[in-house]
């Protein structure tokens, strides 16, 4: 294991965590060469198993918000955010991140997970077995759809229905349109 000649703030024996960029795979390897901005010191209060899983959910959300949607943390304070599927790994992290950035959070989950998402900071929770979120929620600034149409029928339309009519509203999804095309039409070879 080596440090690059211009790397500062790290020592060879430091415990670190991070994630390579999409262009640089190899994280299933025993060793990988990684840019210094893709790694940081592992917090002392978590173990290596937790350190291996947290960056994935954190960077999934951060990448969707910052890199792909163009939102900036300072612009989110006071925004109304809907998270479709708040009880999963990415959803649980997203609730905490948006809450920490000063947002009002609404989310969906099953009845058994309501207390969990509330404890993470959700202001409003809709049990998806009891209510349709698109009938309850209105004028949201951001709809973060973690399920997409391949899991929840017409999810895109339902999420867009709850958005305010502002040009600053955002629909963010983790589902690439290609997934739905492959599901409906198959793989073209």
Where do the language-model regions lie?
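Terminal helix/beta-alpha structural elements that buttress the NAD(P)+-binding lobe
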Residues: 2-3, 8-189
